[in-house]
């Protein structure tokens, strides 16, 4: 099995909206805590490295060598699909280059804007299948398909960010080799354990504070003169 340098390569159009979504997804992926059971089944303790080119490069005949190398050394290609990306010559070249050494199953589509049939690259919307013709011979035919995508469409950046937080599990499930439902359940369990740990810590502090307050009150009862000694001195009888 090939050892990859990057867990994923994020391909996107370098306009403000697409770049924002790519950056948000990048952060979530690299900071995601993989539940222990998923770690055991996937063999991954965390998402180590995600490649995201931050600069728009000039159009040339060939992709830059570092981009080609990063694509070849990435296990998955995360494609941010939008009207801008489908028009981007760079994005289309990145998809074509990736598919030279990877399968279509390793391309993870993210629907940022527009309708799937208008923003997904055509190469991802068809697959070749063997079919038998009327005369009994076998032939290869193209069948239209719609790739499964994480839908992060939103009316503004705030809504898009929220959608990314929700839909990132669909992408992570593919990267970790498990189902979305399994990862979502493990994620909920992990979140619940964290919440219980926090509540346990708060409860512990509350108990300590209560004991301390109780001890202080007992000291007051036993030695009231320690609280305001000046008051008791004022009322000492004079003989």
Question: Could you say what each language-model-derived stretch is?
Answer:
Residues 218-224:
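Low-complexity, Pro/Thr/Ser/Gly/Ala-rich linker/spacer regions in secreted
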Residues 224-239:
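WD40-repeat beta-propeller superdomains and closely related acidic/aromatic-rich repeat-like regions
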Residues 35-48:
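Conserved C-terminal RecA-like helicase domain
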Residues 79:
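Redox-cofactor binding/interface segments in oxidoreductases and associated redox assembly factors
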Residues 1-34, 49, 55-73, 83-89, ...:
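C-terminal interaction surface of TIR/SEFIR-family domains
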Residues 43, 82, 88, 230:
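Residue-level signal for threonine
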């Amino acid at each position: 099995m090939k050892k990859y340098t990057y867990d994923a390569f994020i391909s996107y159009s370098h306009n403000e909206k697409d770049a924002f979504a790519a950056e948000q997804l990048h952060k979530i992926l690299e900071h995601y805590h993989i539940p222990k059971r998923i770690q055991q089944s996937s063999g991954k303790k965390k998402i180590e490295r995600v490649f995201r080119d931050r600069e728009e490069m000039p159009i040339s005949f060939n992709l830059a060598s570092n981009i080609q190398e990063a694509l070849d050394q990435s296990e998955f290609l995360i494609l941010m699909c939008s009207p801008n990306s489908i028009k981007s010559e760079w994005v289309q070249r990145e998809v074509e280059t990736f598919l030279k050494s990877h399968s279509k199953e390793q391309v993870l589509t993210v629907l940022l804007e527009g309708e799937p049939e208008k923003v997904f690259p055509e190469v991802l919307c068809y697959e070749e299948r063997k079919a038998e013709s009327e005369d009994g011979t076998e032939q290869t035919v193209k069948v239209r398909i719609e790739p499964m995508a994480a839908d992060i469409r939103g009316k503004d950046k705030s809504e898009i960010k929220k959608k990314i937080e929700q839909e990132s599990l669909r992408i992570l499930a593919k990267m970790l080799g498990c189902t979305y439902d399994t990862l979502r359940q493990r994620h909920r369990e992990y979140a619940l354990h964290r919440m219980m740990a926090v509540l346990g810590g708060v409860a512990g502090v509350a108990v300590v504070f209560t004991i301390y307050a109780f001890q202080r009150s007992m000291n007051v009862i036993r030695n009231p003169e320690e609280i305001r000694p000046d008051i008791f001195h004022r009322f000492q009888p004079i003989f």
